[in-house]
Amino acid sequence: MIRTFEMELGGRPFVVELGKVAELAQGSCMIKYGDTFVLVTACASKEPKEGLDFFPLSCDYEEKLYAVGKIPGGFIKRESRPSEKATLTARLIDRPIRPLFPKGYHNDVQVIATVLSVDQDCPPDISAMIGSSIALSVSNIPFMGPTASVSVGMIDGKYIVNPTSEQKELSELELIVSGTKDAVMMIEAGANELTEAQILDAIMFAHEEIKKIVTFIEHIVSEVGKPKSEVIVKETDSELLAEVVSFLDTKLANAIKTVDKTERNENIKAISAEALDYFEEKYEGRSKEVNTILSKQIKVETRKMITSEGIRPDNRKLDEIRPISSEVGILPRTHGTGLFTRGETQVLTVTTLGDLRDAQRIDGLGEEDEKRYMHHYNFPPYSVGETRFMRGPSRREIGHGALVERALKPMIPCKEDFPYAIRLVSEVLACNGSSSQASVCGSTLSLMDAGVPIKGMVAGIAMGLIKEEGQIAILSDIQGMEDALGDMDLKVAGTENGITALQMDIKIAGIDRNIMETALAQAKIGRTHILNKMKEAITSPRTELSAYAPQVTKLKVHPDKVREVIGAGGKVINKIIDETGVKINIENDGTIYIAAPDQESARVALEMIELIVKDPVVGEVYTGKVIKIMDFGAFVEILPGKEGLVHISNLAHERVAKVADVLAEGDLIEVKLMEINPQGKIGLSRKALLPKPEKEAPKKIE
């Protein structure tokens, strides 16, 4: 039976249709938001996967180009690997729902959102995120939701739910929030240097809208929801737990307090191996149970140390930042480099400048068709002392790259002020937590070293939270162990003036406004400290670009002159390119960008274009090239693409019988422009520039 439910969301109808399509999935719904249609399905395996210590959830966001009336570009005319946008949206779907499955539930779960039609004013990503919650909630899959999601913009200090395409262009904030009725679960934001208070108000505004959507979903579940499958979780043997805890005594706590990450891991590994050997001998065949208890005890012991004793694994204070060092200009042939080291985390970021034709072409569902500023993040296995296959960027690498890109985007100069394509690549050389935020810092240093006139320096910091038995500890600059065992991962990037990017994932309920306010305030103090440390390496962008960077010159001509610069079949522009070795990009408004390998090539190309667009002036003298000899005169090119006629009578003061007696094709001669007739034809004179012959004195008659 087909059931339809409707509510208003952001001033537009939001419709959920169930029972019409994809009925064999355990949960499915069609979301209709304006003219945006998204089909979301949820399926789970019947049996759990044996031997797993994690929850095997996969979320996919399928972009179909027919949704916007496009045929895929390139040789293969079908959708293939997910776009960057699709990967990021899949992560947005995954992050808020993953913590809401029962502990110990290890069945395969797959959520697929397929975009079938797109209305640019009704975001398909938000539709997919809400749809995933509905599909899971109405299914028999044990999901402890529902969750809901909204996008928030800010124009003139006013917050807007799910802003339209036009409103996004004006907005100073791009915020996506997911949560339950009781708590915020996930935040993703980009902002134009907004204050902590403005960001926090926007999050709370979003949560009020989320509560309305969750109530709407709860009504749908009460009408059509299926009974949930029972999850059978094996309880830990309390006697075995007590024995393991007694065996560990203080040895585990001492190992956790080791400052060096590698040494700490080795110490914990040695103690765990000792415990496994002891209990394998005592209780043969129970190694798996003992190993599970050991993993839990590492978490319990670490969290207790932090909340009760205020001691972190590397003996730092809760708000203490690890030692920082910054360097620039360390690679001689690149356009800009920044090496940022914070504790045992180290990132090298390299900037490459290109002409505007190097901008990334985007063949997606949105209105954006190219991107001139790009950031890519690479996390090789050696950065954590491991081995694995390297088969292109992972979802995590794409997500971290996008976060860093968003953090710096408000600081990147517009193409009118800096007509270059900009690519940043952050190579994580060593990692013990906060590598994405180290990439923010390294990218700032690299851009400044490259001479990109950024509007301000940006630094990033990762914050953590431990909430244990009523005690709360907020941690600045978390390392890997604290990230894995904590309750919140909050990444904040910004300038001295405000926040430019924020990402938050919460693993527990009960994170209220006060906790977030404290965390953001503590992050600001840490961010300011990091910025001051970065200034020890470089304080402002270099005034000159690298000698190995392309030299881009901008010229503005009248739009009517564009055809003259291009010439018939591209003849004129290709001649300039061939003679100078430059690249030329011309826009419809008459803006011309010249990218040259050196200043001299740029100068020559610029002069050639200026001559082409220059209008001939009556009375001016030109040095021209004879391009054609006729019986009645010679055609002379005085400016590129502009030629005039020197009539035979204007070649010399004396009578000229044949033009060829005076001129030959290819000769360079000086001519004066005498007239431009109504048809635009140019009349030239060589004679006007020649001295008049002296008249012979009359002979005396004797």
UniProtKB/Swiss-Prot annotation:
This is Polyribonucleotide nucleotidyltransferase 2. Residues 619-687 form the S1 motif domain. One of its GO terms (biological process) is mRNA catabolic process. The keyword Zinc does not apply. Involved in mRNA degradation. Catalyzes the phosphorolysis of single-stranded polyribonucleotides processively in the 3'- to 5'-direction. CDD domains: KH-I_PNPase, RNase_PH_PNPase_1, RNase_PH_PNPase_2, S1_PNPase. It catalyses: RNA(n+1) + phosphate = RNA(n) + a ribonucleoside 5'-diphosphate. Pfam families: KH_1, PNPase, RNase_PH, RNase_PH_C, S1. It is found in: Cytoplasm. One of its GO terms (molecular function) is RNA binding. Its EC number is 2.7.7.8. GO terms for cellular component: cytosol. Mg(2+) binds at D483, D489. Its cofactor is Mg(2+). Residues 550-609 form the KH domain. Belongs to the polyribonucleotide nucleotidyltransferase family. It comes from the Bacteria. InterPro entries: ExoRNase_PH_dom1, ExoRNase_PH_dom2, ExoRNase_PH_dom2_sf, KH_dom, KH_dom_type_1, KH_dom_type_1_sf, NA-bd_OB-fold, PNPase. Keywords: Cytoplasm, Magnesium, Metal-binding, Nucleotidyltransferase, RNA-binding, Transferase.
